[in-house]
């Protein structure tokens, strides 16, 4: 750097000059590294990106743009049996409902078609591959994405992408860094292709414990650091609390999903969803909770009311009441969606007059 250039650098003292300097620097960073590479944490800035809904209104709202972004990589990770594959299949179901074509690369060889159908996936139209090794899985993924005809591609899971050299080697062979190098090379190629084709790529990942960590979080994800960097969205999915029981049988779990990283909107949002065994995420429970938060459904103590109609005592009875009335459910859903689009959850659209309905049981 020349002496003249060094002299030109000086810290602005005036508040307006400092603000202008920050805006200029942010503009230069976005020009060099892309929109969304820097933002103010408290800002509600969003990118105009195409998305695929997750099927959960609360999670779509937490993601800031209405779903997972197309043309980018999303990582879903967490402990075992936390709901990672369920969430990925729910996204596939939503993409198919919108007329999209989806692919599922089952590296774990554990996809349950019966469960997938229960989540709303059209298994007759779902492209499925069960590769023999990690290289084959990522090559298949690249070919699918390059076709430009795939809307969502899921890899389940990164931990199961075993390098060919490891499979062909002897048990106990030390092959450090093979999987990390494989992922790094593949992601460098895939990122640009995804951006051009608009395919949403979902990598499901597992967590491991780092040995000897005394302070901080001992958890880490498999496959090296590359996926952490290339992913535009990272979702931490894990069960919390005790299972919900009916009698002695556990029927559901509460799952907390946190947006650990989000390059298309503000990160660090959290949602809690009910995961019903054999059925997936309870979308109606999610809708009722969100509508109550937005004051579309009024809550007074344990009683819920919609418009002038009291619809139930307690959330479970309210959900059951709405489930029997599809027209009411759709009306509430439309108002919640309108409030989300308006960007103001505190002011919901006015309730349209509805015909009188029989009084809900309060007991």
Swiss-Prot record:
GO terms for molecular function: ATP binding; ATP hydrolysis activity; ATP-dependent DNA damage sensor activity; damaged DNA binding; single-stranded DNA binding. CDD domains: RecA. Disulfide bonds: none annotated. Pfam families: RecA, RecA_C. This is Protein RecA. Belongs to the RecA family. Gene3D superfamilies: P-loop containing nucleotide triphosphate hydrolases. NCBIfam families: tigrfam_recA. InterPro entries: AAA+_ATPase, DNA_recomb/repair_RecA, DNA_recomb/repair_RecA_CS, P-loop_NTPase, RecA-like_C, RecA-like_N, RecA_ATP-bd, RecA_C_sf. GO terms for cellular component: cytoplasm. GO terms for biological process: DNA recombination; double-strand break repair; SOS response. The keyword RNA-binding does not apply. It comes from Deinococcus radiodurans (strain ATCC 13939 / DSM 20539 / JCM 16871 / CCUG 27074 / LMG 4051 / NBRC 15346 / NCIMB 9279 / VKM B-1422 / R1). Keywords: ATP-binding, Cytoplasm, DNA damage, DNA recombination, DNA repair, DNA-binding, Nucleotide-binding, SOS response. It is found in: Cytoplasm. Its main location: cytoplasm. ATP binds at residues 78-85. Disruption phenotype: Reduced DNA synthesis rate even in the absence of ionizing radiation (IR). Cells lacking this gene have a reduced capacity to survive IR (from 90% survival to <10(-7)), DNA repair following IR is slow. Single recA mutants rarely reconstitutes the whole genome following IR, and their DNA is not degraded post-IR. A double recA-ddrB disruption shows no signs of DNA repair 24 hours after IR. Double recA-radA deletion mutants have a more severe effect than either mutation alone after IR.
């Amino acid at each position: 750097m020349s002496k003249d250039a060094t002299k030109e650098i000086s810290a602005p003292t005036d508040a307006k000059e400092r603000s202008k300097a920050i805006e200029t620097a942010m503009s230069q960073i976005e020009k060099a590294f892309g929109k969304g590479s820097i933002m103010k944490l408290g800002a509600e800035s969003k990118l105009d990106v195409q998305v695929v809904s997750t099927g959960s209104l609360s999670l779509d709202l937490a993601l800031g743009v209405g779903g997972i972004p197309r043309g980018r990589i999303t990582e879903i990770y967490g402990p075992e049996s936390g709901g990672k594959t369920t969430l990925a299949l729910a996204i596939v179901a939503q993409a198919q409902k919108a007329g999209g074509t989806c692919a599922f690369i089952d590296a774990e060889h554990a996809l349950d078609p019966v469960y997938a159908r229960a989540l709303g996936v059209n298994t007759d139209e779902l492209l499925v591959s069960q590769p023999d090794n990690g290289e084959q899985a990522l090559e298949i993924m690249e070919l699918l994405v390059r076709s430009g005809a795939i809307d969502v591609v899921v890899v389940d899971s990164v931990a199961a992408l075993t390098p060919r050299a490891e499979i062909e080697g002897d048990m106990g062979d030390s092959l450090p860094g093979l999987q990390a190098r494989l992922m790094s090379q593949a992601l460098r190629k895939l990122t640009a292709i995804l951006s051009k084709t608009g395919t949403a790529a979902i990598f499901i990942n597992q967590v491991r414990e780092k040995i000897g960590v005394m302070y901080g979080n001992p958890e880490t994800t498999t496959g090296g650091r590359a996926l952490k960097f290339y992913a535009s969205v990272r979702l931490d999915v894990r069960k919390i609390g005790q299972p919900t029981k009916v009698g002695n049988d556990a029927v559901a779990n509460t799952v907390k999903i946190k947006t650990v990283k989000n390059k298309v909107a503000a990160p660090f949002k959290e949602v809690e969803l009910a995961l019903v065994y054999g059925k997936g995420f309870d979308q109606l429970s999610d809708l009722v909770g969100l509508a109550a938060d937005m004051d579309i459904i009024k809550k007074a103590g344990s009683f819920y009311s919609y418009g002038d109609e009291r619809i139930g005592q307690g959330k479970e009875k309210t959900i059951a009441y709405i489930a029997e009335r599809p027209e009411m459910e759709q009306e509430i859903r439309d108002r919640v969606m309108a409030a989300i689009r308006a960007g103001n959850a505190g002011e919901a659209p006015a309730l349209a007059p509805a015909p009188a309905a029989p009084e809900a049981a309060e007991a």
